[in-house]
Amino acid sequence: MMKSTNRSSLILSSNKFVCNNITNGKPMNIPVKNHNKYSSEPVSRSWGQIYSNNIDRYNLHNSKLSKKKYNKSPYYSDTYYVNYDNNDFNNRPYDAIKNCKSAGIIPYTFKNGELYFLFQRAEDPQRKKDSGWNDFGGKQLNSSETTADIAAREFSEETSCLFYLLEKLSIESNNNNNNNIKFKDLYDLLKNNDDLFYSRETIVNLKKLIIESKKFYSDKITEYVLPIFLSSKETYISYFVRVKYIPESDLPKAEDFHIPYEDRYLRECRWFSLDDLMNLNEKDFHKRLQITRIQQRIAKYYEKGLFS
């Protein structure tokens, strides 16, 4: 994992968040605090796993925790958990990453040095519980899907892989080959159009891209020992993932074009600055994000410079 020499800092001025010293980088880790003053082991308040204050994230096997016995997570190659005795089985902290059956992604980016988060909402939801600003996510398709897989697949489907194509364009920009032209053409085909019509060939290409994009963003989430996320325990987990900026107008006004819905609902996608996000009423969010105390968690992550 890359280290960033400059971190985001929180400045409160006239009740506004101002982002300073932003550099290109990646989210570092979730906050880890001591759960009580009598314990030497800190606990992550996000999902209760116990970690050392001095984990060497480049050489975990050389850290102070190496004297203990660990199990490696079956889902995350770089995540280590402390073993518990059989008698303490019921007292083990809940692991949202391992146990949630639904997951999504909250994309964030920096534009002109300012932090933005992308959300979507249905314009005319058929059910009241489907109203409000939401992330890009959904349910597990099968038992082999990890939460990172679920989140990456749903995000790819609901954004028509535009963010993935932009990443590929960035990678290929310095190469003089046909791939750059191909990715640009696919982006133009898949971005929003007024009649919401996409040819059969475009849909075939989208289905292929979803597989690639799912792997790309799943790897992006799991490359960190401690990814940053929101969790409502066993119900839902939403990962924060840094993306390249895409204009709202490019994002399709409907999602999942590779699926033949009879009634496809329209949606609005919007980038929110940190100030705008903090000024929203909690009830403006989708129900599954309300219970995560999303604004409080984002503010704490920002104070710690984790959006980088």
UniProtKB/Swiss-Prot annotation:
User: Highest taxon of the source?
Assistant: Viruses
Which named protein is this?
A: Uncharacterized protein L534
The record lists the lineage as:
Viruses, Varidnaviria, Bamfordvirae, Nucleocytoviricota, Megaviricetes
